[in-house]
């Protein structure tokens, strides 16, 4: 039997909120089987819990935000959720003392390290995968995203930026998902932004915590970060990272092929909602033997059964 996973112990970190610029403390704790990922705002009294579900994503401007019926939000969840998806964490309680997850270095890598530090614990319940049975597609102008049947989880992603530095890089990546491939090839890709947009963003109280410490920054011609890029194709790989996180609000690891052109947070969430609404397009499956699982979630550092 392939089992569900949570973290072995509580771990905590601090960082800066990308949009607020304020200090944020984040804690990740073990959670029971079949509870999923639940985020908790501990800066409110009483604390407010928001389950990570597709219908709770109600804001997708510059990030993915969970918002409850009272308008209480937790923003910028996508990089943390990419790490949770990449390491196959099914159940966790995530506490944060601010309206947003800390941006850290702009990638998922610090969250991967945090989860690895906590340890990964297998739980006494079968892991459920969301298997795609037929294609589901959403479009917005020339942008589109699609999930279709595939034995495993494949990403086929293309961006199209006219900026000379991005245009010079590889803008199309096809990869078969595994935990090792995610950690090595995707998790370190940072968010990126343009100097020309910063004045507008800050006038709208966005990106107040943004800097070259947590983003790739470009002017009209080049990357301004002194150390350059982490990957030659870091731009498209960060968009893939975002998509991993955005898709994980489906509640389970997906078995299928995700194909996308110029998609972002809004379209990614539309795709998840469209998929879940069409119940003949998917089914939940579990596996008895590891050899039967078409996706490799090799546990970093070994797992503990509980």
From Swiss-Prot:
Active site: 265
Entry keyword set: Hydrolase, Lipid A biosynthesis, Lipid biosynthesis, Lipid metabolism, Metal-binding, Zinc
Gene3D superfamilies, A to Z: lpxc deacetylase, domain 1, lpxc deacetylase, domain 2
Cofactor: Zn(2+)
E.C. designation(s): 3.5.1.108
Keyword Hydrolase belongs to the record: yes
Pathway annotation from the record: Glycolipid biosynthesis; lipid IV(A) biosynthesis; lipid IV(A) from (3R)-3-hydroxytetradecanoyl-[acyl-carrier-protein] and UDP-N-acetyl-alpha-D-glucosamine: step 2/6
GO cellular component: membrane
Family: Belongs to the LpxC family.
Protein name per the record: UDP-3-O-acyl-N-acetylglucosamine deacetylase
Protein's organism: Shewanella baltica (strain OS155 / ATCC BAA-1091)
Organism ancestry: Bacteria, Pseudomonadati, Pseudomonadota, Gammaproteobacteria, Alteromonadales
């Amino acid at each position: 039997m392939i089992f569900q996973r949570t973290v072995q112990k509580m771990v905590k970190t601090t960082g800066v909120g990308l949009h607020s610029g304020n200090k944020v403390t984040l804690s990740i704790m073990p959670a029971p089987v079949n509870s999923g990922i639940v985020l908790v705002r501990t800066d409110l009294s009483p604390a407010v819990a928001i389950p990570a579900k597709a219908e709770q994503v109600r804001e997708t401007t510059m990030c993915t935000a969970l918002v409850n019926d009272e308008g209480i939000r937790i923003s910028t969840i996508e990089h943390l959720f990419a790490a949770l998806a990449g390491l196959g964490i099914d159940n966790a309680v995530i506490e944060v003392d601010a309206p947003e997850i800390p941006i850290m270095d702009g990638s998922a890598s610090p969250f991967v390290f945090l989860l690895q530090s906590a340890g990964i614990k297998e739980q006494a319940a079968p892991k459920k995968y969301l298997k795609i049975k037929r294609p589901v597609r959403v479009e917005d102008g020339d942008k589109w995203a699609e999930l279709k049947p595939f034995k495993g989880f494949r990403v086929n992603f293309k961006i199209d930026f006219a900026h000379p530095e991005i245009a010079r890089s590889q803008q199309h990546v096809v990869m078969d998902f595994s935990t090792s491939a995610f950690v090595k090839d995707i998790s370190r890709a940072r968010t990126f932004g343009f100097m020309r947009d910063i004045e507008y963003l800050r006038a709208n109280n966005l990106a107040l915590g943004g800097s070259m410490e947590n983003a790739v920054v470009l002017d009209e011609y080049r990357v301004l970060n002194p150390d350059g890029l982490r990957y030659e194709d870091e731009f498209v790989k960060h968009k893939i990272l975002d998509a991993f996180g955005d898709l994980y609000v489906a509640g389970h690891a997906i078995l299928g092929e995700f194909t996308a052109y110029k998609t972002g947070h809004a379209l990614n969430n539309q795709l998840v909602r469209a998929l879940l609404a069409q119940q003949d397009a998917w089914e939940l499956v579990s596996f008895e033997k590891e050899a039967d699982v078409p996706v490799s979630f090799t546990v970093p550092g070994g797992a503990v059964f509980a």
